């Protein structure tokens, strides 16, 4: 598993799952096995979630404007 070094307000890309397409997700809190936050795109836009870290495909943007697209 990748150590993403995620922080609050980072935006990640979550993989497609079942009927849910790949989408952007804003991180609020980071735990050992999941993140919390809100979907920014897709059918669940604005909805709170707690996706597992294994669902992260890549980092879309960093809250501090650094290293975009790298995990």
Could you tell me what each predicted segment is?
Residues 3-18:
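Short coil-to-beta transition motif at edge beta-strands of beta-rich domains
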Residues 1-5, 26-29:
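Short linear motifs in intrinsically disordered
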Residues 17-49:
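Basic/aromatic-rich interaction segments and small domains that mediate binding to polyanionic partners
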Residues 39-71:
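Intrinsically disordered, low-complexity, charged/polar segments
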Residues 10-13, 26-28, 36, 54-58:
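Ser/Thr- (and often Asn-) enriched beta-sheet segments in non-cytosolic proteins
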């Amino acid at each position: 598993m990748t150590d993403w070094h995620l922080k609050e307000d980072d935006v990640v890309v979550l993989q497609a799952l079942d009927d849910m397409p790949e989408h952007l997700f804003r991180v609020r809190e980071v735990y050992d096995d999941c993140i919390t936050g809100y979907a920014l795109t897709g059918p669940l836009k604005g909805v709170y979630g707690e996706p597992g870290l294994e669902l992260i495909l890549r980092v879309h943007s960093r809250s501090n404007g650094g290293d975009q697209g790298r995990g």
